[in-house]
Amino acid sequence: MMGSSDTPQKPFFYAFNLDDVVPQDHLLRHIDRFLDLSDLRQHLEPYYSHTGRPSVDPELMIRMLLIGYCLGIRSERRLCEEVKLNLAYRWFCRLSIEDKVPDHSTFSKNRHGRFREAEAFRFVFEQVLERCINAGLVSGEGFAVDASVVKADASRQRHHEDDDDWGGGPAIREYLEGLEEDDTVAVAPPKKVSHSDPQARWTAAPGGPAFYAYSTNYLVDTGAGIVVDVEATPAHRTLEVQSTRTMIERLEDRFAIKTKKLIGDTAYGTAEFLGWMVNDKAIEPHVPIWEKGERTDGTFSRSDFDFDEEADHYTCPNDKRLVRYRRKFKQPRSGITKANTINYRSSRHDCAACPMKQRCCAKTPYRKVTRSVYESARDVAREVAKTPAYRRTRRQRKQVEMLFGHMKRILKVDRLRLRGLSGAQDEFLLTATAQNLRRMAKYLGTGPPVVPGMA
């Protein structure tokens, strides 16, 4: 007999518990086990007034944002609607069935105010990272570093002209304040400057049109693929390499974690960065060297010249010396250029009578060999590249790329919603926090978590 859902009389009272309706294998249940925000109120207390009406609970807002970043809900308007309707989201946010969900404008007001001043998102990221460290998911044996370009919320067709008025938006004010600060990193001026987000960098994408973008820089522990630090920069290679120093030193300062080796691509193989790794931090560089000295026209390359470190000179294939100076100065000179290199030159007389001149310096009267002041660190990287361990670590570089792919394809962070470098930093911190929470749910959960509506 066909059944019916009609009942003679509806019950007057219901016994309802949110915990009973959320499945035990739900992703948010696993994440909730590893998310401890008990210290958040104490961290934010100096940024709240002691008088006036009570504000929205900051832990509630953080939990709602984490739902959005963990499950790819990019719009805060939609996030508020989803939390209002979804019982699992209410359970994760500690809301009862009758509690009111905050308005979407609450997030904007707090983000541009006390959350940014207190670095609340950095605090939450480090709380989750500390939980990963205590759970043994971060070993510190090796870190992999890489950067990925993410489109900014800026139109490609609109850029600043010299006679334009900048206006007064938050991203504009942040940019103008940054111009007044001293910048220790030399970066070429951008070709175009966005009118709405001037800190975004005009970037040429391979195989596609250029666009305004920021770079998210990840420092990842190669053990379990945990993001140990993240830094937002304009999309420029020099700034990306500089951010790696910031992340390594910050991790060392706050968690006393010193890595033994750093894995990266050719962008991190500059002489200065290798010198910092080897000489200052005693980090083993698993990085391809940025070589410029090898020639392909049949003439002698720099590797064909032997360097005597004690005597400080090169010896050419014809057994002649290349030295820094051919005469003495009253005041000793270092010979170090602005590019942190030293030029070694041969004698004109030796080169004029040399039978190998056509293979060495056919178009110049003498041969010049340039040596970096960090050449000893480059030699260390060359020796590391010959080891079997280096071949293994090359495969581990993919861990960072997989996280970037997960960020853009699954978590939907392929275009930023917030403007300015601070807005990019907020989004990248929340994304990395969500990825670490999902990692813990995967490795430390009691069973495979079920992610609703996602691949």
Label the predicted regions.
Residues 24-66, 71, 373:
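Basic, short loop/linker segments at the boundary and entry of helix-turn-helix/winged-helix-like folds
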Residues 4-5, 72-85, 95-455:
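Anion-binding and metal-coordination hotspots
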Residues 1-29:
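Hydrophobic alpha-helical membrane-insertion signals
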Residues 13, 22, 35, 39, ...:
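Generic alpha-helix structural propensity
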Residues 12, 16, 38, 42, ...:
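A generic, residue-level signal for flexible/boundary positions that often mark functional hotspots
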